[in-house]
Amino acid sequence: MSKAVVVFSGGQDSTTCLIQALQHFDEVHGITFDYGQRHREEIEIAKTLASKLKLASHKVMDVTLLNELAISALTRDSIPVSNDLMDNGLPNTFVPGRNILFLTLAGIYAYQLGADVVITGVCETDFSGYPDCRNDFVKAMQAALEQGMDKKLTIQTPLMWLDKAETWALADKYQSLDLIRDETLTCYNGIKGDGCGTCPACLLRKRGLEEYLADKEAIQARLTAKC
């Protein structure tokens, strides 16, 4: 029996990965992390979607320790979300170590479940400047987890080389565009669906959807060439 663990935030990218995984694995398990994030509403969204999509299991893990260590606009309400980069060239929404921790815990969970695949929705094409969304990082994490647990483990990244328009096309391929558009939460300010319309996550999501809807056939062809 094939099993996969999906790092699942309840946002556009992870929900798209989850829906795809349900078509390819016998058992799909979701793992969601509560790190005291600014947009904590995403946790309830993830619970609702996990139930609706009938996952084999859905675990919500308390990792608020990360909030104590990682200072970011996503972990401190007192820091406004900015569209400008910080002096170090990173967005102020970057949470240091977040994906290191998430993939480590997802790998441990997969080990316990007897799953040999972890799926995450990170993307280097539209990666928002986050270093822990790059392909080299994911490969390094996979190697470390395999070495550390002495077990074959693959970290799949279905969106790694897709832009946001192609990610919308992927959702549409699985007849889930409306669900992704209306029922997921990507907004850094915690607003479901179209979101606030002004934070970096909402702007990226909106541009991608507009591009996809403007020329579905061409974007679907691009997606087919990549997948």
Curated annotation (Swiss-Prot):
Cofactor(s) demanded: Zn(2+)
Any Gene Ontology biological process: queuosine biosynthetic process
Annotated Zn(2+) binding sites: 187, 196, 199, 202
Keyword terms: ATP-binding, Ligase, Metal-binding, Nucleotide-binding, Queuosine biosynthesis, Zinc
Textual note on the cofactor: Binds 1 zinc ion per subunit.
Enzyme class: ligase
GO terms, molecular function: ATP binding; ligase activity, forming carbon-nitrogen bonds; zinc ion binding
Cross-referenced InterPro entries: QueC (IPR018317), Rossmann-like_a/b/a_fold (IPR014729)
Pathway: Purine metabolism; 7-cyano-7-deazaguanine biosynthesis
Presence of the UniProt keyword Zinc in the record: yes
Catalysis: reaction(s): 7-carboxy-7-deazaguanine + NH4(+) + ATP = 7-cyano-7-deazaguanine + ADP + phosphate + H2O + H(+)
CDD domains: QueC-like
Family in the record: Belongs to the QueC family.
HAMAP family reported in the protein's UniProt record: QueC (MF_01633)
PANTHER family to which the protein is assigned, alphabetical: 7-CYANO-7-DEAZAGUANINE SYNTHASE (PTHR42914:SF1)
Physiological role: Catalyzes the ATP-dependent conversion of 7-carboxy-7-deazaguanine (CDG) to 7-cyano-7-deazaguanine (preQ(0)).
UniProt-recorded name of the protein: 7-cyano-7-deazaguanine synthase
